[in-house]
């Protein structure tokens, strides 16, 4: 057990190598909808007969629930796993207006999904914007959060600090500033958004999902929530710390969210922090290093 002042940092952890897991296969999922104040949120479910707190998985941009397919295949053997489509994406509703994409509203979308399971707590897992939702969920709903898993989205305080002090992070965030411009969504195409997907069969699914999505709604995440210049240091320390154990996974080749933002994460967490950094994996670490990510999650959840 790690105390609040320590970190377990695995690069390519030899302790995971012997675990009898494989994330190569996929598993059948069922499709459902939860409603939050009139907004329907699509999610898939697998392993619903398994006991314990469910794992709710939240994707980022540009993505949809299918990004977790390899993790679902393993985790659903022992856990009830649910993977959502963020509002604006794929089969979820796409309300108009920037304000409808504020992070607190996305947090309540997750709450609606959890409520539908009938369980009192969940393991919240998020990547990219889903990571921002996950961090915020854990801080605002500690009573509903058993554990927290975040992939390639440093704590909001760390990201804000890096934007204010790290010229390279400022430069690498130019894409976000472009997304915040009026009409930016008109430059997007399904093909362009799916360009990062290397698996041919998966790319076809991504193209279908992005053609169902609303590009303007997707970019509203940036317009509403991403810091704008002039960037400033956090005005005060985080008032609310994460109370539950945290697994933080970061692909070190991520050019959008640099690893320097991970520094001092332990200052914002009251419980145990396990940090897994993966050289050679980029922003979409759950796909770039699928087996290692899946094994890390499974072994950590089994503690």
Language-model regions, residue ranges each:
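Active-site glycine-rich loops that stabilize anionic/oxyanionic intermediates
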Residues: 60-63, 128
